[in-house]
Swiss-Prot record:
Myristoylation and palmitoylation (probably on one or more of the nearby cysteines at the N-terminus) enable membrane-binding and Golgi apparatus-specific targeting and are essential for efficient packaging. The keyword Lipoprotein applies. The keyword Lipoprotein applies. It comes from Murid herpesvirus 1 (strain K181). InterPro entries: Herpes_UL11_megaloV/roseoloV, HSV_CEP3_betahv. GO terms for cellular component: host cell Golgi membrane; host cell plasma membrane; membrane; viral tegument; virion membrane. Residues 84-112 are annotated as: Disordered. A lipid is attached at residue 2 (N-myristoyl glycine). Plays an important role in the cytoplasmic envelopment of tegument proteins and capsids during the assembly and egress processes. Also participates in viral entry at the fusion step probably by regulating the core fusion machinery. This is Cytoplasmic envelopment protein 3. It is a lipid-anchor.
Length: 112
């Protein structure tokens, strides 16, 4: 399907204008006016000095994302983990009892 679309587009290009083609109703579409915004190169970077831009980049690289230690994400979190056993698997009855009542055992797990 992509090859068919490409062939249809190439056939509708006008030989006298390299940046125009026909739309579905047969009218000429001038791509130069449609995409002039994309070809304009004037923006704020031309007006900002190189020293100011370098200072801004350096500040962004050295500023910590979380400046307050209380707002930092802890690396070790207490997470409840359910330990269970199969019935009749040769386990002790005390481990079977703890698996039946569903109480989770809290262990420290390191967050990745």
């Amino acid at each position: 399907m992509g090859a068919e679309c490409c062939k249809q587009l190439c056939r509708s290009l006008h030989p006298y204008a390299a940046d125009s083609l026909k739309d579905s109703s047969g009218r000429r579409v001038d791509l130069g006016t449609e995409f002039s915004v994309l070809t304009d190169t004037s923006d704020d970077e031309d007006q900002v000095g190189a020293g100011e831009r370098d200072d801004f980049v350096q500040k962004q690289l050295t500023t910590p994302l979380l400046s307050d230690k209380n707002s930092a994400i802890p690396l070790t979190v207490v997470t409840p983990i359910q330990l269970g056993a199969n019935k009749g698997g040769g386990k002790r009855t005390s481990s079977l009892k703890s698996a039946k009542n569903g109480a989770g055992v809290k262990k420290k797990v390191r967050a990745l």
